[in-house]
Structures are given as C-alpha cells and as structure tokens.
C-alpha cells in the first residue's frame, strides 16, 4: 500500500513532516513492514516501522547516517500488533486466519482480538450503514516517545472516502491515525492512499 504526501508528526509537540509512506502487510501471520521517506529541516529523513516474528519496532535515521531513535521492546511489540489489526481490513485473507477472532456487539460494531507469540491485543471496529469500516479504536496501543517513555492514550484509526480501485474492489482512500487526548484529538498521520497492491483509485 502506498501513500503520497502524508501529513505526519513524530509527536504532539514535534515537527510536522510531509512524507511518502509505503507498507507491506502479510496474511499468513501477523507481520508488516513500513518505510517513510521525507526531509527534516531540509535533510533526508527515513523511518522504518516493522512487526516481524512477534517483535515490533520503529527506527528513524537522518541524512542516512544519524540514528534519531530506535524504539523496541514489549510496548512496541504490542503497539505494532494493534496497528496490524487496525489495518487488517485492507488484507481480507488475513480475516480468516486463526490468529484473529471477532465478536459482534451490534449491527455497526465488532470487537476484534489478535494474538501472536503469547501477546494479545483487541479493539473495536465501527461500520456505517453501508457496512464500510469507519474507525478502529483501542486502549491497548501505548504511545512510545523518542526517549522510550510510554503514555497510555486511547488510539483510533479512521477510514474515509471509499472509492472503487482499478481491481474492482471498493476501499478507503483516506486513512488517519489519531491519539485521543482528553483535551483534544491529535491526528499524527493523515494520508491519501495512492495504490493498494498496485491497484489505483478509479478516476
């Protein structure tokens, strides 16, 4: 899945960037790779976000030489597992795997649970009257700062503007990631999807 010119922020009080974002998700096991390409104060900045073999992490490098952060550990393992769950609607074949389960709450709400290597996480999907997923919310994705500290903030992934792609599948064209602070919502990722598995939005 590819995004172009995403509005992105490294933190609530951190610089805002415009990034290109490319990610690959896998269906046979919870796994994802994501690459960020941008500039920070005019200097090339790359980021790498991953969840592989039950381990998650995020690394940021400036000028291809200087490591700004390298976040790993149990909190990142769970955070990236939750991220995979939030994005699972883009990978329908993963919905049928044994590592994920669903419980319907009502006509518009489904609770989802995912497990990998003894780590479990859950969240709630909400759907509109057209059965389109509009958001995924969870209290199980801690916010890890660049210094490694963790703050427990409700997190939400939002999907919007569903359109047909060139492969005939209707998908969201807008994806946002939001921290739900008590005083305000902080959207740190606000992107338009340019393609999914090579399929582009029909014009």
Predicted regions, residues:
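N-terminal mature ectodomain segment of secretory-pathway/periplasmic proteins
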Residues: 1-67
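Short beta-strand segments that buttress and anchor functional surface loops
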Residues: 2-10, 32-39, 110-117, 138, ...
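Residues that act as N-cap/strand-start positions at coil-to-secondary-structure junctions
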Residues: 13-18, 96, 106-108, 119, ...
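Short, solvent-exposed coil/turn segments at beta-strand boundaries
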Residues: 21-33, 47-59, 105-108, 126-134, ...
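Flexible, processing/modification-adjacent segments and terminal tails
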Residues: 61-118
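Gly/Pro-enriched, hydrophobic low-complexity segments
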Residues: 113-200
């Amino acid at each position: 899945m590819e995004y172009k010119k995403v509005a992105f922020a490294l933190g609530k009080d951190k610089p805002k960037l415009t990034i290109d974002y490319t990610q690959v998700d896998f269906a046979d096991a919870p796994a994802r790779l994501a690459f960020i390409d941008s500039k920070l104060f005019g200097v090339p900045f790359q980021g790498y976000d991953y969840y592989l073999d039950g381990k998650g992490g995020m690394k940021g490098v400036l000028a291809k030489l200087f490591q700004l952060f390298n976040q790993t550990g149990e909190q990142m393992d769970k955070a990236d597992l939750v991220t995979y769950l939030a994005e699972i609607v883009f990978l329908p074949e993963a919905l049928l795997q044994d590592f994920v389960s669903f419980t319907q709450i009502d006509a518009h709400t489904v609770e989802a649970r995912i497990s990998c290597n003894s780590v479990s996480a859950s969240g709630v999907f909400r759907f509109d009257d057209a059965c389109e997923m509009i958001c995924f919310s969870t209290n199980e994705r801690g916010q890890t700062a660049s210094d490694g500290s963790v703050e427990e903030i409700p997190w939400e992934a939002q999907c919007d503007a569903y359109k047909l792609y060139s492969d005939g599948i209707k998908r969201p064209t807008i994806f946002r990631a939001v921290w739900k602070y008590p005083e305000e919502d902080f959207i740190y990722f606000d992107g338009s999807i340019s393609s999914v598995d090579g399929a582009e939005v029909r014009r």
